[in-house]
Amino acid sequence: MKKAWFPLLPVLLTACVGGERGAPPVVANDPFCQEVMPRVEAFLEGARAEHPLPDDERYGGTLVTATIGELTQGMMVLTTADHGATQHQQFVNLMTLLDYDEAFQPRPYLAESWEVNDDLTELTFHLRGDVLWHDGTPTTARDVAFTYLRATDPRTGFPNAPYWTHYVPGPEGVEVVDDRTVKVRLHPHADYLDPWRTLAILPEHLLGEVAPELLREHPYGLRCPVGNGPFVFREHRDQDRWTFTGNPAFPEGLGGRPYLETYVYRVVPDQSTLLNELLAGSVDVYVAPRPDQAQQILDAPGTRLVSAPFRDFVFVGWNARRPQLADARVRRAITMATDRHQVAEAILLGYGRVANSTLMPVHWAYDPEQRFALSYDPATARALLDEAGWTDRDGDGVRENGDGVRLSIEILYNQGNQARKRIAEIMQVQLREVGIEVTPRVLEMGALWDIVSNPADRDFDGVAIAWVGEFRVDDTGLFHSSQADEPFGFTGTHNPELDHLMDTLAVIVDREAARPVWARYEEVLTDEQPYTFFYFLDRLMGIRDDVGGFSLDARGEWVSVRDWWVPRSRR
């Protein structure tokens, strides 16, 4: 399960390019940027001369997208799990070895082909020979090997390092056969190609001498990234905008240069302001408007709304270390005493669906019947609490256990997130009806995450939060007992059968053989109830009517960015 923060968990920028919002990029005094950016300019000049703009109305012009969050750590692939940043790494500035088609099946991208040996222990990629870094240097197998070595090196601190658990780390795990061939070694496991869909390849010739622990602070990520993808980096103004230029030399076999001459990503922290900018025409694509803004976009002249089932799900995670929450019956009672369908309808306004586990509706193992889902049933919730030894012993309406501990819980949510505030407030009202006292508490996101993720702290009962799931669902980092002292294992779940099922699912290659195991996993997870799952969101996009080539699905908001175009009439 990939933990992606956009727009869920903001991470502090550690290599800012300007001290104030919108300040010009500071590259003049940075030796790395001073060296590489002139080479990028020369590459662009030569590429434009060799590949002039085609005489087609779709080519040229500027398109502006906007959303509320920065691209945390920018193009430094190995130091961020930010959703917006990884989308730009995959689809805008850099390239992955493979991507997914509309049916979520692997297809060639930087790698033109691959094969795996019979026992699934060696995977060989064959790279395209026509992909250049934006300084004119060819992309080779050495870049792939370098990126892999850094991704599997614990000194790097790669947030998605668990994705590579079943690969052989370090130099023993990768071999450069020639400039266009690289072999990696692995242990047989499910969906072994999926990590290569998300890991954009970095330039070894620019970063190979940088110590793994220094990559986070390196200017490459935020000041002067040199990619090899369809768009060339031009400028970053901190907390304001990123500007990219279409790459004239992007391979014809991959569609050639993008239609757009200039692509701009803007940061507009206030969603009301962002909506007004879309309606006024100063923004072409508003990424992830709130559901309560959808109707305004639909009703306004010149704009349209696009929606698709997506991968983020919202939940309240429970700290099972607390005496009030240690018994799974209490956690099940909490979920059954909460009308999650009412919550989803009130918040999503029809743009989403109730969640019951980490398996998203687009996942191949998703059960459309949701056989193990807990229904809204306050009577059964009361019975479970009685059975667990929690009764109202003093008549004040709040249950206690035999030691006199009140069934009182505090739910944290992050400042500025109205949806999670509403969830906590609705739970406060509904759980009171079964004898549970709830106190919502708002915190700044960084402070909240410090409490929840730090094994030395974890002074909390429940937390309203969200994850963006990946196509390869592996909940080991969330619920495996071995991860209870790791940042994402904050629930402290200890269930031997759940551990066994997660270990088994990770290595079953055949999907049909895995289906019954997934079913049992969902059943046990429902009984354990480490999270009260609320809903999967649809991704919404507000778009100007005259923007062409736009499509949206669970792969991401920028999956079709190479095909976006604007008419000549407004250039």
Q: Each predicted region: which residue ranges?
A:
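Ligand-site clamp/hinge motif
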Residues: 219-222, 249-296, 423-429, 437-439, ...
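Detector for C-terminal structural segments
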Residues: 26-30, 46-47, 237, 241, ...
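Surface-exposed binding/hinge segments that line
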Residues: 58, 126, 162-210
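Alpha-helical secondary-structure segments
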Residues: 64, 140-147, 179-185, 229-230, ...
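A structural "hinge/loop" feature
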Residues: 48-54, 67-88, 110, 137, ...
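Gly/Pro-rich hinge or "lid" segments in bacterial periplasmic/extracellular proteins
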Residues: 91, 101-105, 199-258, 262, ...
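Extracellular/periplasmic solute-recognition and catalytic clefts
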Residues: 19-20, 151, 157-160, 174, ...
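N-terminal lobe/hinge region of extracytoplasmic solute-binding protein
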Residues: 39-40, 46-51, 61-118, 149, ...
